[in-house]
Amino acid sequence: MIACAPPRPSHPVIGSKNFTEQAVLGELLAQEIEATSHLKVERRFYLAGSYICQQAMLAGRIDAYVEYTGTALTAILKQPLPQPGHRDPDAVLATVRRLYQQRYQIAVGPPLGFDNSFAMVIRSDDARRLRLTTLSHAAADTPHMRLGVGYEFEQRPDGLRGLSAAYGLRFNGPPRTMDLGLLYRALNDHQVDMIAANTTDGPIQAFHLTVLQDDRHYFPPYQAVPLVRDEALRRWPQIQTALDALAGRVTADDMRVMNEAVDGQHRDPAEVVREFRAAHGL
């Protein structure tokens, strides 16, 4: 008796990792494919982390999902990150694109338009008062600032120690280490003056906070990019039309608003994505 693989679906299958932003991006990709191709799209969201999504791609259980270039480079491709100051987003993207094609026959689509990286965040009234837009600008003022960080950021090799060295940052006392969920409350309550967060966190938008630009490119690039199996693109070339339509269309502010709508307002990701697409002429 010959063992047969399960039949492939007659329609594209879009996956996602297991957090809100990923479900939103998976839904965005699915809706855009449906709108531009009139294909039926199956959703398989919340598939745990990058490794599970990659295995699902290789097995043909999903045809596409959205990944982040720095994660793809280190977690999937097992490549070392360039040294701080040499982490050009285009160079990282080119390496990821080349190796995914060589190793896995997976196409890396055009970036959606935003990074989800670490971010140093301050209150907007402080940003205006001190005229701060970049971390380089902030270095002169950090001796008067109290810092709040999550446990991981304090320990990571690409976290606080390296960041402080790259920018010459000194703070008013040791950092206050706390659960990530408490950082924004501490910042709003003036218990700290700067926090280490993530660029697409919903509270940044909800509380009108300011992200200081990483102008020396210390943090690795984590551009959001769609990954699609070559076989799926050959079978449904209309998918490429959807990828091209989404290229550069999602800003970090857009992502914060959508994340906050789902997490903070408990709205359905599909509804949030439909509103985003309508507002942006997609």
State what each model feature region is:
Residues 2-3:
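C-terminal motif of bacterial Sec signal peptides marking the signal peptidase cleavage site
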Residues 9-21, 39-45, 143-148:
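Short, well-ordered beta-strand elements
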Residues 40-55, 173-185:
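Short helix-initiation/N-cap motifs at beta->coil->alpha
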Residues 20-40, 157, 161-165:
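Short, polar/charged alpha-helical segment
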Residues 69-165, 169, 174, 178, ...:
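Contiguous mixed-secondary-structure segments that line small-molecule binding/active-site clefts
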Residues 57-58, 138, 186-188:
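Hydrophobic residues within well-ordered alpha-helices
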